[in-house]
């Protein structure tokens, strides 16, 4: 099992934190375990409440069903169903930017 450094950033929220996340753990779940309060609703990859944007690195979010190909290509990620596949930096609280 690999573990990656996941950096969660959001200037408006005063968030700039790096956590260790195993490659079989959803980023949202790992953040919660570390006491980081990120937005979420369905926890199933079927809405956009937890949306973030990948700044660098890669994730596996094959369990998601909400984002379209263009949104994924633009770097959007649903943190509730995203596993890290490398060290990754994600801007959080990006739901409004999807629309």
From Swiss-Prot:
One of the GO BP terms on file: electron transport chain
CDD domains with a match to the protein in the record: fer2
CC cofactor: [2Fe-2S] cluster
Gene3D superfamilies per record: 3.10.20.30
Keywords: 2Fe-2S, Electron transport, Iron, Iron-sulfur, Metal-binding, Transport
Molecular function as annotated in GO: 2 iron, 2 sulfur cluster binding; electron transfer activity; metal ion binding
Keyword hit for RNA-binding: no
Summary of the function given for this chain in its UniProt record: Ferredoxins are iron-sulfur proteins that transfer electrons in a wide variety of metabolic reactions.
Subunit structure: Forms a complex with heterodimeric ferredoxin-thioredoxin reductase (FTR) and thioredoxin.
Family in the record: Belongs to the 2Fe2S plant-type ferredoxin family.
NCBIfam families, A to Z: fdx_plant
Protein name: Ferredoxin-1
Gene that encodes the chain: petF
């Amino acid at each position: 099992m690999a573990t990656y450094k996941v950096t969660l950033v959001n200037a408006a929220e005063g968030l700039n934190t790096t956590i260790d996340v195993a490659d079989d753990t959803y980023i949202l779940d790992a953040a919660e375990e570390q006491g980081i309060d990120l937005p979420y609703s369905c926890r199933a990859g079927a809405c956009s409440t937890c949306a973030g944007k990948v700044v660098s690195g890669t994730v596996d979010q094959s369990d998601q069903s909400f984002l379209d190909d263009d949104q994924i290509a633009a770097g959007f990620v649903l943190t509730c169903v995203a596993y890290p596949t490398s060290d990754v930096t994600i801007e959080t609280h990006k739901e409004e930017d999807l629309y």
